[in-house]
Swiss-Prot record:
Pathway(s) the chain acts in: One-carbon metabolism; methanogenesis from CO(2); methyl-coenzyme M from 5,10-methylene-5,6,7,8-tetrahydromethanopterin: step 2/2
Name this polypeptide is given: Tetrahydromethanopterin S-methyltransferase subunit E
Subcellular location: Cell membrane
Major subcellular location class: membrane
Protein transport recorded as keyword: no
Summary of subunit composition and partner proteins: The complex is composed of 8 subunits; MtrA, MtrB, MtrC, MtrD, MtrE, MtrF, MtrG and MtrH.
Pfam families, per the entry: MtrE
InterPro entries membership: MeTrfase_E
Catalytic activity: 5-methyl-5,6,7,8-tetrahydromethanopterin + coenzyme M + 2 Na(+)(in) = 5,6,7,8-tetrahydromethanopterin + methyl-coenzyme M + 2 Na(+)(out)
Source organism of the structure: Methanococcus vannielii
The EC number(s) this enzyme carries: 7.2.1.4
Transmembrane segments: 4-24, 63-83
Membrane topology summary: Multi-pass membrane protein
Family: Belongs to the MtrE family.
Amino acid sequence: MDPTLISLGALALAGAAATVSGCAEDLESDVGSQSNPNSQVQLGPQMGNIHRYFNKAISGEPVSYGLYVAVAGSVAWALINAGLN
């Protein structure tokens, strides 16, 4: 198999993992905010409501982390192939 194809597959996998971990972090912080009475943002009334997940999805934060990984990996791959390692 072509090494470039393997590199791009690994990059896509890292981007997907960053997206999933960003979504999981958002869900975990929502639950933590619900149980903390001293939290700056009280999310208790929003727990379990679809609009909360929709707002997270359109904010794009988890997807932006995946994009950061993809851009950083592409730049690193280009520099390594240019002999700048």
